Amino acid sequence: MSGVVESVEHEERFVLTRAQVTRFFAAIGRHATVETYDQARPIAYTRTTYFDTDDSFYLRSCHGPIARRLRLREYAMAASLEDAPVLSAAACLELKQNTGTARSKVRIQASPTLLRMLIERRGLRDPAFASMDPLSALPTLQSELSIPTIAPRLTTWYRRAAMTAESGRLRITLDERLTFCRPQIIGVVGAEVAPNAADIVASGPARILEIKHWGERPLWLARALEGMEPAHGFSKFKMGMEAISRKLEALVRPIAAERDAEADAQRDAETALTGTSDFASIPGAV
């Protein structure tokens, strides 16, 4: 989870069935190494909070030549699938940009407390930021945070398994049980961070395979992926924002319908009163 500035690589995504996942990992087992960040808590989770503006600056970029996302990444660990995941001391803020399968990141890593301060100061400088890694990424991220109306809009949560191969030039991740949530505040190290039912907006695909690599795919990987179609248009950010929008519409629609019904009733009452008055004013009408 080290800081990376302007790293450029290729990224492919696949939305898979359980059988496809089983077959894929059986095929690559001897070529890739499992990443474990905490031996005592080997089950890893990722919580990602996406930022956007009131006019959907970042969401609109998903439909252009360069898709941009500003996001906060927090990591949680658990001893087993039954245990509650707790927040780790590692967190990062990053600007991710995609053009086709090519992607680049400007990322800074720091404690959740320090990143909270960076976000709240909206790009203003502070001596405390000197400890961030790498410091060269700070101006770019401060510039993004200074955009008017920038604010957290969506949080995603999923369990992640990661593997590396080809001397680190290839990274494979499997995200399971993707969940879209209302935006969450930055957590406290050691706190339980699994989303509660009140914060959950919708569920995403059950299994998402992501391949990040520099250069061409190795032959063994190409063989393992045979018969699997890349999900070219898939985006956690885009799907999650659409889910948030649908949720808001579902909440607003009954309120708007009730307001319209009240307005119609008021107009009917006013029309009835006006009609009585007009009729009574006609000479000879009794």
What residue spans do the PLM features occupy?
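Phosphate-end processing signature that detects enzymes handling 5′-triphosphorylated RNA
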Residues: M1-V286
